[in-house]
Amino acid sequence: MSQKYLIRIAELERLLSEQAEALRQKDQQLSLVEETEAFLRSALTRAEEKIEEDEREIEHLRAQIEKLRRMLFGTRSEKLRREVELAEALLKQREQDSDRYSGREDDPQVPRQLRQSRHRRPLPAHLPREIHRLEPEESCCPECGGKLDYLGEVSAEQLELVSSALKVIRTERVKKACTKCDCIVEAPAPSRPIERGIAGPGLLARVLTGKYCEHLPLYRQSEIFARQGVELSRALLSNWVDACCQLMTPVNDALYRYIMNTRKIHTDDTPVKVLAPGQKKAKTGRIWTYVRDDRNVGSSSPPAVWFAYSPNRQGKHPEQHLRPFRGILQADAFTGYDRLFSAEREGGALTEVACWAHARRKIHDVYISSKSATAEEALKRISELYAIEDEIRGLPESERLAVRQQRSKVLLTSLHEWMVEKNGTLSKKSRLGEAFSYVLNQWDALCYYSDDGLAEADNNAAERALRAVCLGKKNFMFFGSDHGGERGALLYGLIGTCRLNGIDPEAYLRHILSVLPEWPSNRVDELLPWNVVLTNK
């Protein structure tokens, strides 16, 4: 009997051992399942993060493509589509009203360009007139043979272009001898812009204006002169530009002093390609602009712009340029300006004012690519701020400040509360989240204008000044050296200041190149564009 129990016990122990082994295997399988599940969860999380990152990258690339497509093929206006549609509808209504009131028929079967045209503006009165008088071929009446008496005239004007022509001015200085002694006298030689140079001030002004105002590279100008029968190499033209810049340096220095002697300056910069000596690849230099323009507050002080070149974008360059300045600096959020707003700056910190146009542009780019309702609402709120600025443009500082305190402040407070709320629901890595974060990080500098009637809501004055440089980059693509960048900055400043004051740059350059060789150094301020009286010669 005991033997049977022993066998039974052994059998039970075997079964128990098998069950324990089975449980152990199940535990291993369960552990493997848990590890697999954890691995899959981790892989899923990584995949979701990768998908989210890819979606952001796709959104960013689509936005970049759309932006480049607009720049290449479409308008660069930042008006909302509904605003454009409203303007087009209003324009169409005004055209219809104008046709109705003036008695012009609006035949839908006739193309617009073939219908009766509106009154054409007369040609400018200051242009010289060349009269071509045409007499009838008939000397007597073609019907009855009677005598023809003068009745009147039928006149029409046509605008014609007289191409520029080169000419040689030969100066003959008469020499005379004394009849009693050996003394000889002769007329003194007139001064020239370039000592012993063959170019007159008019030709030099044409070359300078051609390159830095009309964006014609020197090699193209050389080809133009060649078609007129005069060989002027690109190297020769480059030497002329350099000599003219040396001559006009005192005027450029006077322009710099004028701009620094104000309470508010707009600044911005743009990259330019520069050939580096001994290297095949061009390096990237920088053109900085500094604008004095207080016309929006009704100031009678002439607007002016000064440019500077630097071989890089280090913050020490604007620090050096703005060393004598004290006041308001309107700029973007470039970190290189930070030391200018520090209390440790020599002479005291400048007052930082940011640019709403720059902030708005970031939101607008998101709206164009995504048609986001949140972005559209932000643009609408910002447009309300600009509507107030349009109303007060040209008013004195005190009146501008009063309106901003009463109306703009309320809108800014509401906008800030709304953006903070919306930003909390946006991904920090999304483009709209980045745009909102930019605005909120710059909030104090963006809102400063509401507490100062002199400050502006944006930095568009500086951005407009840089357009000439950007157009030049598209045509001659690079400066030949750092020295070339410096002389380009000088000419962009003088020409840009002429444009701001409605002065013909070529006529101005011709004048100062004519008088500078003998001009007193203590009266150079009299040669600033707004101080010069130009003739129509």
Feature roles, as predicted:
Residues R62-Q64, Q158-R263, I495:
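Short, positively charged, Gly/Tyr-enriched micro-motifs
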